[in-house]
């Protein structure tokens, strides 16, 4: 998916746009035990509560692709016949009315997702009549020809508040208010199926993590039977290690500056052109910069091997995830290179 498609779905999470009729939830304690489960009718909730639930669901697909959001892709074999894909399809096709499937998902999540706090699993099913867009990008409601049916899951830590003094307007005095347990912004979330090219893609899902340094591998394995992408927060450090370990004594200030200049130019050009497709670089593109810097063939061969080991063969990495430091730092066995990226 691309950011524009995610934003189109996020705009639905308002009372006047959403087709969500029920909210399904499960409260899980820190020991992974299911404390309680519930189903709420949106139409019977006070307006304020409806807004709060929609806000928490919306935040489960917040951020940008390549940072807090990433695509998960199922294999053809999984889509054809696998327990994990079959469960997601049961949830989606039933609009979460299949109670056994919902319970199974709760148990999978509780058994694989370990947070520091208790947490609340929120589930919702939505049906989106996708408006037709003409070639010039204008939206035409009457031209809608397809419906996108999907489920959304937001998993929110439940935190204990501190005692505070609150104002009692009847008495005109302040009194202590005890502790409460409140649902915080989602830590993890997903949407299934994917909304690729503004259409249903049963081979994909959208995955969200608030913490860009943690991909919650056990959770992804339990629910999707997939390997999660490398966390965005880990990619820069991994790239630094690949360069320094592979190039060794050839990892000079000039090489470091040239690599980062090339990556930054790609990011700036992508922003200026306002391209919709996510920006990504391959090993070959980074390798071309290293060759231009005069890196020797043996070191290039070592770089190719270490890059593929770290990121995967044929992988594409958002270049902005490889940048971001105010001061670049590369360590070799004999020296630490610190470079101002703007110089």
Q: What would you call each of these model-derived segments?
A:
Residues 3-19, 24-331, 338:
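Long, hydrophobic alpha/beta structural blocks
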Residues 342-343:
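Hydrophobic, glycine-enriched assembly/anchoring segments
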């Amino acid at each position: 998916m691309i950011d524009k498609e995610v934003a189109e779905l996020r705009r639905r999470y308002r009372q006047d746009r959403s087709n969500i009729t029920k909210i399904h939830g499960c409260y899980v304690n820190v020991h992974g035990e299911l404390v309680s489960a519930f189903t709420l009718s949106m139409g019977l909730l006070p307006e304020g509560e409806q807004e709060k639930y929609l806000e928490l669901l919306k935040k489960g697909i917040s951020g940008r692709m390549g940072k807090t959001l990433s695509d998960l892709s199922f294999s053809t074999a999984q889509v054809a016949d696998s327990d994990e894909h079959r469960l997601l399809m049961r949830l989606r096709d039933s609009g979460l009315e299949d109670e056994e499937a919902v319970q199974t998902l709760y148990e999978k999540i509780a058994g694989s997702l370990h947070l520091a706090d208790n947490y609340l699993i929120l589930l919702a099913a939505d049906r989106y009549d996708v408006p037709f867009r003409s070639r010039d990008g204008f939206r035409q409601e009457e031209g809608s020809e397809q419906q996108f049916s999907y489920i959304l899951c937001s998993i929110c830590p439940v935190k204990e508040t501190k005692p505070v003094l609150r104002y009692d307007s009847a008495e005109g005095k302040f009194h202590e208010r005890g502790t409460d347990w409140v649902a915080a912004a989602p830590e993890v979330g997903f949407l299934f199926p994917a909304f690729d090219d503004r259409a249903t893609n049963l081979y994909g899902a959208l995955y969200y993590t608030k913490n860009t340094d943690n991909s919650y591998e056990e959770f992804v394995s339990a629910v999707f039977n997939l390997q999660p992408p490398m966390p965005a927060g880990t990619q820069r450090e991994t790239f630094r290690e690949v360069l320094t370990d592979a190039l060794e004594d050839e990892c000079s200030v000039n090489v470091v500056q040239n690599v980062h200049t090339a990556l930054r130019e790609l990011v700036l050009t992508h922003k200026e052109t306002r391209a919709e497709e996510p920006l990504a670089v391959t090993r070959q593109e980074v390798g071309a910069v290293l060759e231009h810097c005069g890196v020797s063939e043996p070191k290039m061969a070592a770089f190719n091997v270490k890059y593929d080991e770290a990121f995967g063969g044929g992988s594409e990495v958002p270049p902005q995830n490889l940048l971001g430091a105010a001061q670049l730092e590369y360590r070799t066995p004999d020296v630490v290179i610190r470079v101002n990226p703007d110089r």
